[in-house]
Amino acid sequence: GILPLRKMLDAGVPIGLGVDGSASNDAAHLLNEARQAMLLARVGKALEAPRIENGRTVFGCDLGPSDMTPRDALRLATRGGAQVLGRAHELGQIKEGYCADIAMFRTDTLSMAGGAVHDPVGALLLCASDNADYTIVNGRVVVREGKMTTVDMGPMIERHNQLALQLALDAA
């Protein structure tokens, strides 16, 4: 089934999104997870039976986009994640005294063309989001111009692939 996300949020249920790597999200891309949550919430609404309102037939597919907007989904990935971790007092938003955890994305790319002109925040979920150009974690730059600054990714990726292959072989 599809989680009744809007109903749960309206009832005050704390909900957050996150990624922890290949075990649960092969891309380890939080924007992809936020987009998926948004689309599933919209599909869930679209599956509702038509109803009559003010003498007019209303279909769920007409209401889906308003049920979960890109900003709603981004809130789940930021403030929502901080809330469910019990850290809303220090994470989840750009605010004085909070951890400086920030990801920055270019909006002048082909994948963002058109969408970012009208709504750059929404375009992060509605367009094909690239990897972050800059990422700051607790005030420290860890990605600069799309490249990790804290580790050499080549050996890490090679080791990761070796372990994934070994795991698959062991499971066979």
Give the ranges of each region predicted by the language model:
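Charged helix-capping and loop-helix junction motifs
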Residues: 2-6, 118-120
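His/Asp/Glu-enriched, well-ordered alpha-helical/loop segment
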Residues: 5-109, 126
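Active-site microenvironment of metallo-dependent hydrolases
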Residues: 25, 72-172
